[in-house]
Swiss-Prot record:
Role played: May act as a bridging protein that binds pectin and other cell wall polysaccharides. Probably involved in maintaining esterification of pectins. May be involved in the specific O-acetylation of cell wall polymers.
Renumbered ranges of motif GDS motif: 176-178
Presence of the UniProt keyword Thylakoid in the record: no
Claim: Coiled coil is one of the keywords in the record: no
Protein name: Protein trichome birefringence-like 10
Transmembrane segments: 33-53
Other remarks in the entry: Contains 2 motifs that are conserved in esterases, but it is unlikely that this protein belongs to the catalytically active pectin esterases.
Organism: Arabidopsis thaliana (Mouse-ear cress)
Subcellular location: Membrane
GO CC annotations, alphabetized: membrane
Membrane topology designation: Single-pass type II membrane protein
Protein's GO biological process: circadian rhythm
UniProt keyword annotations, A-Z: Membrane, Signal-anchor, Transmembrane, Transmembrane helix
Amino acid sequence: MSKNSNVEENGGAKPICEALRRFKRSRLVFEPSLGVLGFFLVGVCLVCSFFFFDYRSVAKSYGLSDKSERFVWLKFDNISSSSSSSSNSSKRVGFLEESGSGCDVFDGDWVWDESYPLYQSKDCRFLDEGFRCSDFGRSDLFYTQWRWQPRHCNLPRFDAKLMLEKLRDKRLVFVGDSIGRNQWESLLCLLSSAVKNESLIYEINGSPITKHKGFLVFKFEEYNCTVEYYRSPFLVPQSRPPIGSPGKVKTSLKLDTMDWTSSKWRDADVLVLNTGHWWNEGKTTRTGCYFQEGEEVKLKMNVDDAYKRALNTVVKWIHTELDSNKTQVFFRTFAPVHFRGGDWKTGGTCHMETLPEIGTSLASSETWEQLKILRDVLSHNSNRSETVKVKLLNITAMAAQRKDGHPSLYYLGPHGPAPLHRQDCSHWCLPGVPDTWNELFYALFMKQEAPSSSKRVEEANSTGNVTMS
């Protein structure tokens, strides 16, 4: 009897043991997958909580740098169209406020802003085909949605109508190389957005904007103002060398003379100058272009010395030829190029760049040396109280981070894209980086206008007539 009962007990136990063995085998099969899945879920929870609970505090607690505004590529922070960005912004003063006077607007970061760009290329008829990247093949538009955020203050939003009112009956003149033209066309687009009837904006000589060399003058008839561009890559004239010069001297730069078109800029109310891209051996001595002072060609003078002497000539002209009571002068610094694996002649590229290099500089040592020369020249002449003050648009460091902003393959218009070995990594797509230069220009211009407006109000108060502008 006991034997049968043992058999029965064993027989009943077998299915249970077999089930346990099968469960163990299946558990061994699924254990790695469950482990990976669990690890993944824990990781997701940690990442989400990191951003949910304010990653600035987490970063600080671990001794990490608080660079929240540099994590913009994640789009978790500093989106001005969202209320989440208001905390840091509200702590900063407005640049145009009296308390914002000490703010360095060129010290800051690029932040993602979905309210940008300020215009669309298809809506602006004042753009060269070479700058209309999105119209002619460039499919990514990330480069249009970055805003410059100064570290210690907030820039004013560009107000095209207000700017045009300030320019009423005035001349705004850009002088420089094709990068200066890039900025000039950007400003035309920004300003034209406030004019409903675009037939009231026209080139006074009927010249087309695309592939036109020399100078162009666009009039905003409703405001009786002009926004002009004069091509002068060196700001000093390039001409035939003196008779008897060595055969290798094909042309010369007259370092002690202003460009011949300078008589056309002299009466400008606002003057924006730039030079830099042509001050290198490739554009000068290697092509037979040497430097001249008086009637003597300086065969041994290097490019940096020549650049410095030319800048001194420009500054002297500003101080002696311009009316300090009328003309505001701005000087924009060099905007770095971003060729990889060569330059524009040797197969350099930038077509794979779609994001900025946040927080780091991609500028060469030559670029920083050029900036130092410019700053030294302007600083040396800044203490002369009787002269025109030159305001520096110091965009070099901020532009150095924007390797993503160039036309690359998309500068040939409807005939593009260009061959891979012939890319443009010098100029800038529009809308794009030059719009930011103009936002900074606008901020400095409006800051300069504010004291004169206050002075007019005070004068009106003293006579009993108050007018607001």
